C-alpha cells in the first residue's frame, strides 16, 4: 500500500500566511480497491466445514488501540446467527475498516487458519508501524535531525494524522523550504517506510539596513549590517550577528569607538526541540543634542543571556512553549570621562542586575486568524554582584505581556492587527528594567523613549490594506492606518500616570523575505516641550529599510538510503 504526501510551499490565504499540507492517497498497488483477501477456503480456514456456521463469539488478539469490547460492537449483529464464508470476510473487513477510519492506515485484521467447529472466530489484529525514515537527498542539515522529529510524533501503531503533524512541524522549521514524502510498504505485514525528499532553504543570509529607531538625543538614525545562518554546523543551530553604526542626524556616520552589536546563537538539544539559546548585546551611545552634548555624556551597556526553550504542546493550530532565561545586564555612564550617576538607582554611574525570566508562549494559527501571546515573569536575583542604590530592591519582580491578534477581515487580504503591550511591577525598578513608550514599536508619532516608566500599557490597532500585489496575488504593498494608545506610571516617586496617543498612516513594501521597507507618519495628540524639536521623529516620521540576500543552497538528490 502506498500513500504519497506532497508538501507545498507556505502560502498566504486571505492575507495570513499558513502552512498547508496536501495529502494525495493512491489506490494500493497490486490490490483491488475493495482490498478483498483471497477466499477463506484458500487460507485453510474452512476445510471440510459446512458452508455456514453459527457464530457464537469472536476473539481478538494483538489489539492495543481498541478494546475487545469496542471491536465486538462492530460485529455484534452477526453473533448467534448463521454466517457464511463471505460474511466472515465481512467481519474481517468491518474490523479493518474501523482501524482505517481512525487513520491507522497500515493496520487491520487477519483471519488465520483455524478450526471453526466450536463457532468461535479468532481474529489477529496487525497494528502497523513506521519502521524506517529514508532521507533521499543530502543537504547541510543532518538526516538524523529529520528522522528524530518524525519518530518523535509517530508512535506505534502508525496513525496518519500523527505522521501529517510530524511533517507539518518539520516544514514549519525555518531551515526547510519544502518536503516531499511517500509512505511505502515494508517487507513485513504492517510495516511501512517513509521516503523523504527535503529541500532546505539557503543556509546563509547577509544584508544592510537603515532606520531612525534610536532616541534623537543620541542620534536617531542608524545603519546596520547583519549576518545570519539557519544551520551553522549542520546540527540545526542558528547564529545571528548584527553590527550597528550610530548616525548623527543625517549628516555624519560615527565610525569611531562606538560598539553596538548583538550576537545570538541557538542549538537544539533534543528531538523534542529543547533549545539552548545564548545572547550577547553591546550598546554604546553619546548624548549629541544641545546643550547636553557639551558635557560629553557617554554610556556603555552590555547584556549576557542564556536560555532554555521547550515546546510543551503542538498541533496543526496550537503551540504552547516555555522559555527559562537567565540574564545579566550592566551599565556604566561617564560624564567628561568620569563615572557619574544620572539614572535613578545607579551607584557611581554603574548599574548591574541579574534576573531570572520565565516566559510562557502561545500561538494559534488558522486560515483567517493568528493569535500570539507571551508573558514574562522576571525575578531579580542577588547574584553576580548586583549594583544599585539601597532604595531599590535587588530581588524585584516585573510582569510583562506581549500579544498580537491578526484577523483577515475582507476577501482582498485586508488584515486587522491589534497589538497589546503591558508591564506591571509593585516596586520601583532601575531604568534598564523600565518600560519605554514612544517610537516606531510602541506609540508612533512620538520620540523613541518619550516616556520611561515602571508600569505601562500599550494598545495599538491598525488595518493593513493591500494596494499592490504580484501576479500570484501576494500582497507587496500595504497601506496602514493606525491608532496607538499608551499610558505609563511609576510605582513610587513624583511622576504620576501619563498618557500619550496618536493616529496616522504607514506604508510597507515587502517584495521578498530579505527586502523590507516601512514608513510611518503619526500625529501626536499630546505636545511635549522639547528644546531641539527638529528631528524627523518630532514630525512624527519613522522609517526602516532592510535589504539582504541569502546564499548557498546545499540540497542535492542522492536516492534511497538502505
Regions found by a protein language model. Give the residues of each.
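Outer-membrane beta-barrel "beta-signal"
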Residues: 227, 536-562
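Outer membrane beta-barrel transmembrane domains
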Residues: 287-289, 325, 329-346, 355, ...
